[in-house]
Swiss-Prot record:
This is Glucose-1-phosphate adenylyltransferase 1. It comes from Vibrio parahaemolyticus serotype O3:K6 (strain RIMD 2210633). Its EC number is 2.7.7.27. NCBIfam families: glgC, PRK00725.1, PRK00844.1. It comes from the Bacteria. It catalyses: alpha-D-glucose 1-phosphate + ATP + H(+) = ADP-alpha-D-glucose + diphosphate. Belongs to the bacterial/plant glucose-1-phosphate adenylyltransferase family. One of its GO terms (molecular function) is glucose-1-phosphate adenylyltransferase activity. Pathway: Glycan biosynthesis; glycogen biosynthesis.
Length: 405
């Protein structure tokens, strides 16, 4: 689809994911052992054969740049590119003021590509979407803007833009993060919310961005300013994400916002269910990323006991000796000494766990080194004196930490 340009918003600071975002942007946070959060948005474009993509970066972007260079370098192929673009600061020495401002400051790059449609997507959610199906819906409706949406429990909807639609899928109401969200007619416990993914007719987008940039009263945000201004015209439509079908996937779609530590941990636990709602193994929808050249994971018994790996994901380069690993995700080069008991944990890679450690519901960031005999997640009151502990009791060991020495 040569006339389509992708713009991925990847500048999120991710303050609610701290300490995982202390040294990296939210889109570059590791996920599922092998991936980064941004990989899922990129795969949605690439698997739909949409290969002209700008990735707009901002905060702490070095890790993200490195990942894109190593794993997503398709430049050199005619008319195909995935290019990261740092904050342009074209309107002064400041960061992007909102999602619309981020796109506006890169207007020149878009105009040079001469697209017919522009797809603007976020980069910090876990889901699979065939974007071509959304584009087809957009074209059939002759829309100037199409917003993708999904049903959300009403109690959670205030964190999103809440949408009202008519029988034809036309947007007839929109409120950004309302305190009292409106429910779907006939479904009092659910609301229809924006996923933050947009398909614009290019010339409409360019015009709206210029007009919005000149408005000093605007917050320069799609949800707060652009969409409320556009939908009363009657040519803004809503694409129902639940109708998106991918070969080899379950009929019930999966979408997770992993903006908090608890949500991030739960999304990993979803991967480990017997009948996982989100699969990493669909050959018809491969999940591309950067895979470092590492040997296979190794599991060996020790004098302290046999190795047990139960309902877990273990990445290449990992070495587990005589320990028990249950419902956990071990990233690249996780080194687990003997007699450890690790349950419901996420190790982000290059982690050393000493002999006899006990870990329960712990996220261990990269390059951490935990001394032999250390217990984490067993006594939360004690853990709170040393580490970040989430509302639901998930302990986070920060990047590069030395614990118990």
């Amino acid at each position: 689809m040569a006339g389509v340009l992708g713009m991925i918003l990847a500048g999120g600071e991710g303050s609610r994911l701290r300490p995982l975002t202390e040294s990296r942007s939210k889109p570059s946070v590791p996920f599922g052992g092998s991936y980064r959060l941004i990989d899922f948005a990129l795969n949605n474009f690439v698997n739909a054969d949409l290969m002209r993509i700008y990735v707009l970066t901002q905060f702490k972007s070095q890790s993200l740049f490195h990942h894109l260079k190593k794993g997503w370098n398709i430049n050199g192929i005619t008319d195909r590119f995935i290019d990261p673009i740092p904050a342009q600061m074209r309107t002064g020495k400041r960061w992007y003021e909102g999602t619309a401002d981020a796109i506006y400051q890169n207007l020149r790059f878009m105009e040079l590509e001469e697209p017919d449609q522009v797809c603007i997507f976020g980069s910090d959610h876990i889901y699979k979407m065939d974007i071509k199906q959304m584009l087809n819906f957009h074209t059939e409706k002759k829309a100037s803007l199409t917003v993708s949406a999904l049903r959300m429990p009403l109690k959670e909807a205030s964190q999103f833009g809440v949408i009202e639609v008519d029988a034809e899928g036309r947007m007839i109401g929109f409120e950004e993060k309302p305190a009292n969200p409106k429910s779907i007619p006939g479904e009092p416990d659910f609301a229809l919310v924006s996923m933050g993914n947009y398909v614009f007719e290019a010339q409409v987008l360019f015009s709206e961005l210029v007009e919005d940039a000149d408005n000093e009263a605007s917050s320069h945000d799609f949800g707060k300013d652009i969409i409320p201004k556009m939908f009363p015209r009657g040519d803004v439509f809503v694409y129902d994400f639940s109708t998106n079908r991918i070969s080899g996937e379950k009929e019930e779609v999966y979408w997770r916002d992993v903006g908090t530590i608890d949500a991030y941990w739960q999304a990993h636990m979803d991967l480990l269910e017997k009948d996982a709602p989100f699969s990493l193994y669909n050959r018809k929808w491969p999940l591309h990323t950067y895979y470092p050249p590492l040997p296979p994971a190794t599991f060996t018994d020790s004098d302290n006991g046999r190795v047990q790996i139960i309902d877990s994901l273990v990445c290449n380069g990992s070495y587990v000796r005589g320990s028990r690993i249950e419902k956990s995700v071990l990233g690249f080069r996780s080194n687990i000494a003997s007699a450890c008991d690790i349950s419901e944990c996420i190790l982000l890679g290059d982690v050393k766990i000493g002999e006899g450690c006990v870990l329960r519901r712990v996220i261990v960031d990269k390059d951490a080194d935990i001394a032999p005999g250390t217990q984490i997640g067993v006594n939360l009151q004690e853990d709170k004196k040393h580490f970040h502990v989430s509302e639901e009791g998930i302990v986070v060991i920060p990047k590069g930490a030395r614990v118990g020495y």
